[in-house]
Amino acid sequence: MTRLTLALDVMGGDFGPSVTVPAALQALNSNSQLTLLLVGDPDTITPLLAKADFEQRSRLQIIPAQSVIASDARPSQAIRASRGSSMRVALELVKEGRAEACVSAGNTGALMGLAKLLLKPLEGIERPALMTVLPHQQKGKTVVLDLGANVDCDSTMLVQFAVMGSVMAEEVIGITNPRVALLNIGEEETKGLDSIRDASALLKTVPSINYIGYLEANELLTGKTDVLVCDGFTGNVTLKTMEGVVRMFLSLLKSQGESKKRSWWLLLLKRWLQKSLTRRFSHLNPDQYNGACLLGLRGTVIKSHGAANQRAFAVAIEQAVQAVQRQVPQRIAARLESVYPAGFELLEGGKNGHSRVHN
């Protein structure tokens, strides 16, 4: 394994350095080839490194930043006032070649805008998309995008997402000829927004994409598709709804409930069932798949959930390591070169092709 360097915006997220710095130390402990650039306020970061040993400190460097982009700031305003912010400095380290990827739990809109401004989209990509890998009930994984980078998407953008998602499924998960589906309100050809139906027609003409049609949200975790494509609004709502349900389910499994009046053997049986079910469904825990990759850029950017805990942010760092090692941007660029000659172009009026819904 070759050495690699990541830039961490340690000031971003709901909890800032109190979570991101311990997560950085955890990541260093798990990967001896990793070097981390901690971008933020040195006075806040330094005390949190007290438990780091000499070997870990040799693979750490604090990069000062003057400010933090607020999580509730409007993206346009945040970008204009971003100079010297921890997020922008971390991205600039990637642009300058000092780091191979950036990880941030900060403002999603600002991260998207700054990454596009500084790192530039790949040739043939209109706008980058946020992608994550979710577990399903067949104990496999599904690539899902967009998860919030683009609230409104035309048909061409959805096709581009399908191309990028296919590359991720092949290169990161190792799926040969991955199945691709569009998230829709029904499986019938006439259902959904014009943009979705137009994207469906386009995907049928691309030989390098194994397009299987529409998928409804209730089948997200069934394993019926390897890549699920949707606009950022739908994807974000779907993901957060799923995370909330899974967290509630796992919490119910762990709760003790009314146990005081039960006999000892019923208590033992209940605890055994709780442990068994928790083990059975623990792979659905959202913390285990934290970290959405911003696909379609000339560099690697990972967006962590803003409310991520230490374990979850460490997972996001590992996602960045995997993306760099798999050379995701380069592989997407190569696939785009092979796909575009297949004959899809920006549809006339595509930007306005998503205003009508067919039920």
From Swiss-Prot:
EC number: 2.3.1.274
Main location: cytoplasm
InterPro entries listed in its UniProt record: FA_synthesis (IPR003664), Phospholipid_synth_PlsX-like (IPR012281)
Subcellular location: Cytoplasm
Catalytic activity, as annotated: a fatty acyl-[ACP] + phosphate = an acyl phosphate + holo-[ACP]
Example of a GO biological process term: fatty acid biosynthetic process
Disulfide bonds: none
GO molecular function: phosphate:acyl-[acyl carrier protein] acyltransferase activity
Top-level lineage group: Bacteria
The protein's annotated pathway: Lipid metabolism; phospholipid metabolism
Recorded GO CC terms: cytoplasm
Keyword Transferase belongs to the record: yes
Main EC class the enzyme belongs to: transferase
HAMAP family: PlsX (MF_00019)
NCBIfam families in the cross-refs: plsX
Job of this protein: Catalyzes the reversible formation of acyl-phosphate (acyl-PO(4)) from acyl-[acyl-carrier-protein] (acyl-ACP). This enzyme utilizes acyl-ACP as fatty acyl donor, but not acyl-CoA.
Protein family according to the UniProt entry: Belongs to the PlsX family.
Subunit (UniProt): Homodimer. Probably interacts with PlsY.
Protein name: Phosphate acyltransferase
